Structure formats: C-alpha cells, structure tokens
Amino acid sequence: MKKIIMLKSLIITSFFISLVLFSGCNSAEEVSANTDSKSSAQTQINQIMIPLSEITEKAKWYDYEVDNKTISYFAVKASDGRIKVAFDACDVCYPEKKGYRQLGSDMVCNNCGLKFAIGGIGTENKASGGCWPGYLPVIIEGDYLKISKQNLEKSKWRF
C-alpha cells in the first residue's frame, strides 16, 4: 500500500515539475524582446527584428552578443526616408574599435574622421580599401527591419 501511495506521489510531483520547467519554453514562432539600454530590437531564432517605427533620422545603435563578442551596428533613416544600416565598425579602422558617431546628416568615423552621407551608406564599400561603415545586409518586411544573425556573425572579426 505504501508503495502505491509513494508511486502516485512521485507521478504527481513529476507532473508538476514538468509543468514548471516547460511552461517557460517558447515556440520557434514566438518573438521575445531583447531589451538592452540601446534598443527594443526583437530576436527570433535566426534573425533580429527592429520595428521600423523605432528608426528615425537620429542614428540608433544596437548590440548582438555572440562568442564573447559584442557586435555593434546602427540604423538610421536617410533624408529620403530610406532605412540605412551598417556595422559600427569601419572596413579599415575596425582594429581601433572606435565606431561611428552621427553629425547632422553624416556618420563620422571616430578613428580617422572621415564623413559619410547617411544616404550613401548601407552598401558595399564604394572606395575599395578605404574607410567605410561595414556593410550589413538587411530586409524590410512589413513593419520590421530584419537582420540575419548569420550576417552579424560573419563580421564578428571586426569586433
């Protein structure tokens, strides 16, 4: 009789422990907020999603953590309304780890001082071998800017 009561107690306890452990799991479709002090970017399994409403003509910086590295990038709306995104690291000056700052309608390299019109960034380096905000491919879909985590991770060497 004691064995049956113990077995029932064990089964019930296991059931409740399972409920507690698995109730916090999200499905692959669910989006969870990645709340850091810089952004309200959201993350899914393979991509980062930034609400378009969050991107203005004032540059906003975002961080992505991987392999003990912080990959930093920024998003800004150009004067023509197009969204521009780039790594916060230059193709040449990245070893200095100084990134960019916004000065009016330009992004300025904090290392060498070169200025880049916001409307022109978000592409591959136009001056091969020179300073340029690192290219980060993005997709705009619905109300979100989407960034592949794989594209972020491919450029972790800059950071």
Model regions: which residues?
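Bacterial signal peptide processing site
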Residues: 26-28
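Iron-sulfur (Fe-S) cluster-binding segments and ferredoxin-like electron-carrier domains
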Residues: 96-103, 114-123
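C-terminal motif of bacterial Sec signal peptides marking the signal peptidase cleavage site
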Residues: 21-24
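Bacterial N-terminal signal peptides that target proteins for export
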Residues: 2-11
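Processing junctions and N-termini across compartments
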Residues: 19, 84-87, 103-106, 125
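Short cysteine/histidine-rich metal-coordination sites, predominantly Zn2+-binding motifs
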Residues: 104-112, 123-135
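N-terminal pre-ligand scaffold of iron-sulfur
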Residues: 31-102, 135-159
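Sec-dependent N-terminal signal peptides
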Residues: 10-18
